[in-house]
């Protein structure tokens, strides 16, 4: 699963943008033997993604990361865009490329409106400290599947096989025996 659109509240936007940009800017793009991000399926796919990014940029979006050109026949470096208008193809459709759109909102109502501005939403997730808020928001957003991530870890349960403290803790947990 790859995230295409992230709707984030203004108070945490800069911190999130900085963390995502730092992670994506270090990815090695290219040959699958040495890369962390390989090619798109075809060169046509890459051309389509580049066209969607260019269209969003021409409509006023700002490219925070990425150079809006191919790094090889079907290769694209990761892109981050902000200010993408909901009427653009990049917001309305899935790009199926290494493109992340960040949208800043001030209210939950604004987030719901933006999330519902696209007819495509196979999977959605909500990261919050308030599970009741997550359920309320999920009831208002059209999506096929929902994931709730309650942050920060404040409960005694384990998440996936790695748990709260990493795989080493899971491997040595006496409850596994």
Task: Indicate residue ranges for each PLM-predicted region.
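Juxtamembrane/interface motifs at transmembrane-helix termini
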Residues: 4, 35-37, 54, 132-135, ...
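NAD(P)-dependent aldehyde/semialdehyde dehydrogenase
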Residues: 10-120
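Active-site PLP-lysine loop of aminotransferase-like
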Residues: 1-8
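Structured core elements
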Residues: 7, 62-65, 125, 147
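Conserved C-terminal structural/oligomerization subdomain of aldehyde/semialdehyde dehydrogenase
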Residues: 75-177
């Amino acid at each position: 699963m790859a995230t295409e659109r992230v709707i984030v509240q203004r108070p945490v936007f800069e911190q999130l943008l900085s963390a995502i940009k730092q992670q994506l800017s270090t990815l090695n793009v290219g040959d699958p033997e040495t890369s962390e991000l390989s090619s798109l399926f075809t060169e046509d796919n890459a051309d389509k993604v580049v066209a969607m990014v260019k269209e969003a940029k021409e409509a006023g979006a700002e490219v925070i990361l990425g150079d809006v050109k191919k790094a090889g026949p079907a290769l694209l470096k990761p892109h981050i865009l902000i200010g993408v208008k909901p009427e653009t193809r990049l917001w309305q459709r899935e790009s199926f490329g290494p493109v992340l759109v960040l949208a800043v909102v001030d209210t939950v109502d604004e987030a719901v409106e933006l999330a519902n501005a696209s007819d495509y939403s196979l999977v959605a997730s909500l990261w919050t400290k308030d599970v009741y808020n997550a359920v309320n928001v999920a009831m208002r957003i059209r999506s096929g599947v929902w994931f709730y991530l309650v942050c920060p870890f404040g409960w005694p349960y384990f998440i996936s096989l790695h748990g709260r403290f990493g795989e080493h803790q899971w491997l040595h947990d006496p409850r596994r025996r």
